[in-house]
Amino acid sequence: VKYKDLNGDGQIDEKDVRDIGYPKYPLYTAGMNMGFSWKGFDFSMTWAGAFKTSRLLSSMYRVPFGESNNSAVMKYMIEDAWTPEKGNSAKAPALSFKSKSHNYQDSDLWLRDASYVRLKNIEVGYSFPSSLLKKAHIGSLRIFMSGYNLLTFDSFKVSDPESDPSGTAYPLIKVVNVGLKVGF
């Protein structure tokens, strides 16, 4: 990894440090709810998104490129690592067993866009007509299927864009429910 002499004094030091990226908390958030019902069928969904937000990958994502070789290597680290064939098109430093502690210092190399759009909730259901339920002495009957966090569009790819960038938190789980609601 090469660092740029931003102030032009011929030295790479703390005077070359600059703010990079966007804040951890997004500058813009958005959400949208929609739904409809027709002849007993119903459908609803909720979308949410965050924009102009960045994550600086924590040491867990950088250590394999430095001097500590006791960490697992993730798929992106191998695919994106520098090789003579890739040259300047590589997105990550060369993997090495030698001391390369400068490879995991804070820099825009480890900065990722954490903007995303996520399908937070989707539900499809059917309510049976009361004329069919009277004989069974049932007031209402609805079957449904719902899902949470099933789809996310983002360029972060390393972990969940909503989770803590330290890599120590579980990502949001995907949930699918099937249900039956009976009223008497």
Predicted regions and their residues:
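Surface-exposed loop/turn segments flanking beta-strands in extracellular/periplasmic regions
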Residues: 7-10, 64-75, 163-169
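Extracytoplasmic gating/loop element in the C-terminal half of outer-membrane beta-barrel translocons
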Residues: 50-142
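Transmembrane beta-strands of outer-membrane beta-barrel pores
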Residues: 38-40, 49-53, 121, 128, ...
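C-terminal beta-signal and terminal closure region of outer-membrane beta-barrel proteins
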Residues: 81-91, 104, 150-184
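Membrane-embedded beta-strand positions of outer-membrane beta-barrel proteins
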Residues: 45, 143-145, 180
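Outer-membrane beta-barrel domain signature
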Residues: 17, 30, 48-55, 59-67, ...
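Outer-membrane beta-barrel transmembrane strand signature
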Residues: 1-46, 91-114, 118-121, 125-133
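Strand-connecting loop/turn motifs
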Residues: 38-41, 131, 138-140, 173-175
